[in-house]
């Protein structure tokens, strides 16, 4: 089943076109990796999928369907709740771990303390953080290690029960151990969530993704099952990128 359908998507900032005529379908409960050189439009694609592009001064034409319904027909709050995003640099709010995790649920109307406590516990467990920080929930989130901060941001995105999780280079600033922790977590998540991850790490894309899209200069060059993309790319530009000839 396709949870997202992208048809002839073009994205611009003013007169500068970032993506042009991109079409692809995203499979539900699968991990899709977006690869390509810096500046090719990967992150722009993510911010367009949950309409954050408009907050950043961008605009788009074409069509994005979420569960066969145009995303523009949804309220923005609903889209951003349903299609969550985690950024490259960990962005914990400058208050306690606990308040970080109840912020979004309270914004969306959940007030019951027991329910909030359950959300905190469940999301920390999903992010593999519960045993590490359960006794320190009142500690400032900014005092966590870099890897813990990123997992907290992922847990925070899960507190409002998204269906799709967008991740923009979530491991780029992390060491091997923390990267492995997050990859293991994402593989488990795909049972419950659809994941789209931008990564420069081709080995990471091969390890965890079911599908891979290669973008070059704003164009979707190739998209398909990850194993086939890496083993036998159809486009020579894909082959050259994978082999490290450029990018």
PLM regions: where:
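Conserved ABC ATPase "signature" region
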Residues: 113-135
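Helical segment within the ABC ATPase nucleotide-binding domain
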Residues: 180-191
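Catalytic Walker B motif of ABC-type/P-loop ATPase nucleotide-binding domains
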Residues: 165-168
